């Protein structure tokens, strides 16, 4: 066992003394059992994580019952909804790297034999997943689960995206103070990740098809008995996997990553999943080309439209059959998935999900009646995005196939929000928000406030937005993000002028500014070099080491330090 490094031999007597002092070693024979880390992310200020201490205690009991010794540690967490629209959002994506590094540090410093990961929201799930693939120690994931959907006084289903859009509606005068306060108090009624197909739930659903979590991980409610039983079963499965030496890199292959994108397409998941899945590919040593995502989109139907793209919540999806029903439906179309690869259950993806039929075809459409024959995400290329950009086409009005408009440019999120709120932004505009990428932000902040304000003011079909920043999973409308290269790295998005005509072509998956190459080259020669906005602390180090969105926005050591 890996843990023999810290508990076997005379030279490890001091370490054994310290282990006895923890109180986790109950019997002398415990030193002969696997040591299992519980990588938790309990934190009081994140509603998706306030109940994780309870779940960790259930995991501890089950791990001990299964014949191993549990040791819990905690990571940090940032709630994107609370951090939205201010300096706090600069820390959200960078927190993913801290979580991965922190988990790696504890796991390798103490030579654990296996790891039970308990994530839930935003950057915690991908951060832990990066650590799992990096350390390649037997691992299993069981998230905290989604919250129930809210309900307004008028009986309307609510999620957090409803609240963000309500801000725009209230400021625009189409919502009363009473209605606004009612939504505020009822949008998030329980603990758990936000109830729609936002980043947290997108990633927790993807964990099922990747093969690192048990079925229904993405949809069983945080407050349900099923969630607690799932924790127990996952603990037993992990101890079995330690015995069989089943490791994350045995599971997370290029085919598994393909299937993650396919499920994302079928469910119209968050654009952030592209960023995170590319980061996971990097940790797994898998060379994953962005263009592969469009190939997957072309063969994957869009089967389930969930909030913010509809009124359906994650609980509705669960009642309709959950992710297993969607996987089972996709398996019926040959070539869509790779169903015969191994998963954390020790069984194949096919064995985990075959026969799990759709229970409500209004929520999960069958293959013969998809929302669209192609998936809900697209990668756009063109002279504005030579290395790609991402749009959630599932969140765009189906009638819109092409959008042409005049650029109105802003070099920060805050400037754009002010212009939208004071009606400077009008119908026919393409709002360009730049210098908000991984380096430029820094931290690639989410642009939920401007997109929500656009939709909330009734301009969702008439105004587009492009940015080198990213979007919340709650974003909908004509919103193109992750434009690469970013402005801070010299990307052409930094060369756009007010009034330039921009074309977003969803059919041909292109993003272009109607300006000649000669003019762009002239503008490039006149552009001043970017200077980092933050000079000290973590964000300064992040700015120096972070890479482009098209490679997952990961931090990399400079090549000159690792060249042989």
UniProtKB/Swiss-Prot annotation:
Transmembrane segments: none annotated. Mg(2+) binds at residues 80, 122-123, 446. GO terms for molecular function: 2 iron, 2 sulfur cluster binding; dihydroxy-acid dehydratase activity; magnesium ion binding. Keywords: 2Fe-2S, Amino-acid biosynthesis, Branched-chain amino acid biosynthesis, Iron, Iron-sulfur, Lyase, Magnesium, Metal-binding. GO terms for cellular component: cytosol. InterPro entries: Dihydro-acid_dehy_C (IPR042096), DihydroxyA_deHydtase (IPR004404), DiOHA_6PGluconate_deHydtase_CS (IPR020558), ILV_EDD_C (IPR056740), ILV_EDD_N (IPR000581), IlvD/EDD_N (IPR037237). It catalyses: (2R)-2,3-dihydroxy-3-methylbutanoate = 3-methyl-2-oxobutanoate + H2O; (2R,3R)-2,3-dihydroxy-3-methylpentanoate = (S)-3-methyl-2-oxopentanoate + H2O. SUPFAM superfamilies: IlvD/EDD N-terminal domain-like (SSF143975), LeuD/IlvD-like (SSF52016). [2Fe-2S] cluster binds at residues 121, 194. Pathway: Amino-acid biosynthesis; L-isoleucine biosynthesis; L-isoleucine from 2-oxobutanoate: step 3/4; Amino-acid biosynthesis; L-valine biosynthesis; L-valine from pyruvate: step 3/4. Its EC number is 4.2.1.9. Homodimer. Belongs to the IlvD/Edd family. This is Dihydroxy-acid dehydratase. The lineage of its organism: Bacteria, Bacillati, Bacillota, Bacilli, Bacillales.
């Amino acid at each position: 066992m890996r843990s023999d490094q810290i508990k076997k031999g005379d030279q490890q007597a001091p370490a054994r003394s310290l282990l006895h002092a923890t109180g986790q070693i109950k019997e002398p024979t415990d030193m002969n059992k696997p040591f299992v880390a519980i990588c938790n992310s309990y934190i009081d200020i994140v509603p998706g994580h306030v109940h994780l201490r309870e779940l960790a205690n259930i995991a501890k009991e089950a791990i001990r019952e299964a014949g191993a010794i549990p040791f819990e540690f905690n990571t940090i967490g940032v709630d994107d909804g609370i951090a939205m629209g201010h300096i706090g959002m600069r820390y959200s994506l960078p927190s993913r790297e801290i979580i991965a590094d922190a988990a790696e540090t504890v796991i390798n410093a103490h030579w654990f034999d296996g790891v039970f990961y308990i994530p839930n929201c935003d950057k915690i799930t991908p951060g832990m997943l990066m650590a799992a693939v990096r350390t390649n120690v037997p691992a299993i994931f069981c998230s905290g689960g989604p919250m129930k959907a809210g309900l307004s006084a008028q009986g309307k289903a609510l999620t957090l995206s409803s609240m963000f859009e309500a801000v725009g509606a209230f400021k625009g005068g189409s919502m009363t103070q009473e209605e606004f306060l009612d939504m505020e108090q009822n949008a998030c009624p329980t603990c758990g990740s936000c109830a729609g197909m936002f980043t947290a739930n997108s990633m927790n659903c993807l964990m099922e098809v990747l093969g690192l979590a048990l079925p229904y991980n993405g949809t069983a409610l945080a407050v349900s008995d099923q969630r607690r039983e799932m924790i127990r079963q996952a603990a037993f499965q992990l101890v079995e996997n330690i015995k069989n030496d089943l490791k994350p890199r045995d599971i997370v292959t290029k085919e598994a990553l393909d299937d993650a994108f396919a499920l994302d397409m079928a469910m119209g998941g968050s654009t952030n999943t592209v960023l995170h899945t590319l980061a996971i590919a990097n940790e797994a040593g898998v060379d994953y080309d962005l263009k592969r995502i469009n190939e997957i989109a072309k063969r994957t139907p869009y089967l389930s439209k969930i909030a913010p793209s509809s009124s359906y919540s994650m609980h509705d999806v669960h009642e309709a059959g959950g992710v297993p029903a969607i996987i089972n439906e996709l398996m019926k179309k040959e070539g869509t998935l790779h169903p015969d690869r191994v998963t954390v259950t020790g069984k194949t993806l096919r064995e985990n999900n075959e026969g799990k039929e759709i229970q409500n075809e209004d929520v999960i459409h069958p293959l013969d009646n998809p929302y669209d024959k192609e998936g809900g995400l697209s990668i756009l290329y063109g002279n504005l995005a030579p290395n790609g950009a991402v749009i959630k086409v599932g969140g765009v009005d189906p009638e819109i196939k092409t959008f042409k408009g005049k650029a109105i440019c802003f070099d920060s999120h805050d400037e754009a929000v002010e212009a939208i709120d004071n009606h400077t932004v009008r119908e026919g505009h393409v709002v360009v928000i730049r210098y908000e990428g991984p380096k430029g932000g820094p931290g690639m902040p989410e642009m939920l406030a401007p997109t929500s304000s656009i939709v909330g003011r009734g301009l969702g079909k008439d105004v587009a937005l492009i940015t080198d920043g990213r979007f919340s999973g709650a974003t909908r409308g004509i919103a193109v993000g992750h434009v690469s290269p970013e402005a801070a790295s010299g990307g052409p998005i930094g060369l756009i002028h007010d009034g330039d005509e921009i074309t977003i072509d969803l059919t041909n998956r292109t993003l272009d500014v109607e300006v000649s190459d000669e003019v762009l080259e002239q503008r490039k020669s006149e552009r001043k070099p970017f200077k980092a906005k933050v000079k000290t602390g973590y964000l300064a180090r992040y700015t120096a080491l972070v890479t482009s969105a098209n490679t997952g926005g990961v931090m990399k050591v400079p090549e000159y330090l690792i060249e042989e």
